[in-house]
């Protein structure tokens, strides 16, 4: 059976008016490297091997902030959650009220990001926190025979 995984390149359409704040946030707060800077598009490297392009568009061609909050979030991993949380808050982003212990916020341009620790156990989000295993396209029951809670 063919296998599929997410790649390490992403792109987001964002309002052209947010270009300076996007550059400042991703470069100065998150520590990204701007690989290529342009009028219509910027390419950033985040960490060792993740690339994200920001495609600068007119307002009517992009999601507004409420659209992003209803769509998808990206996860940011850091080796110092407390320090990064302070830097993000000091920049002045919109913090979202999500029933989860992690920081969810909207970065400049509207993207929703979740901040977690690099070594944090995230098995509760993977459906594997109660001992079940993903085998051949289906979850198996725990070794003790109980079905995991939903």
Task: Show which residues each predicted segment covers.
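N-terminal beta-strand motif that seeds the catalytic metal site of vicinal oxygen chelate
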Residues: 1-23, 71-74, 121-150
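Conserved positions at the start
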Residues: 7, 41, 100-102
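Vicinal oxygen chelate
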Residues: 14-20, 69-112, 117-120
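Short, flexible helix/strand-to-coil boundary loops that buttress conserved ligand/catalytic motifs
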Residues: 26, 88, 126
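Conserved acetyl-CoA-binding loop of GNAT-fold acetyltransferases
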Residues: 27-35, 92-94
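Conserved short beta-strand elements that form part of the metal-binding/catalytic scaffold
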Residues: 33-68, 112-123
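A general structural signal for short secondary-structure boundary/capping elements
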Residues: 54-61, 92, 103-104, 116-125, ...
């Amino acid at each position: 059976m063919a296998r599929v995984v997410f790649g390490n390149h992403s792109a987001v359409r964002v309002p052209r008016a947010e270009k300076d704040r996007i550059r400042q946030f991703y470069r100065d707060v998150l520590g990204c490297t701007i690989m290529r800077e342009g009028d219509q598009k910027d390419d950033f490297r985040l960490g060792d091997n993740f690339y994200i392009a920001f495609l600068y568009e007119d307002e009517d061609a992009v999601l507004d902030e409420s659209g992003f909050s209803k769509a998808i979030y990206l996860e940011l991993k850091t080796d110092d959650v407390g320090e990064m949380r302070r830097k993000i808050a000091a920049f002045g982003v919109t913090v979202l009220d999500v029933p989860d212990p992690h920081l969810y916020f909207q970065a400049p341009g509207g993207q929703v990001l979740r901040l977690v620790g690099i070594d944090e156990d995230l098995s509760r989000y993977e459906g594997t926190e109660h001992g079940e295993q993903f085998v051949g396209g289906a979850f198996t029951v725990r070794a003790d025979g109980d079905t995991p809670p939903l």
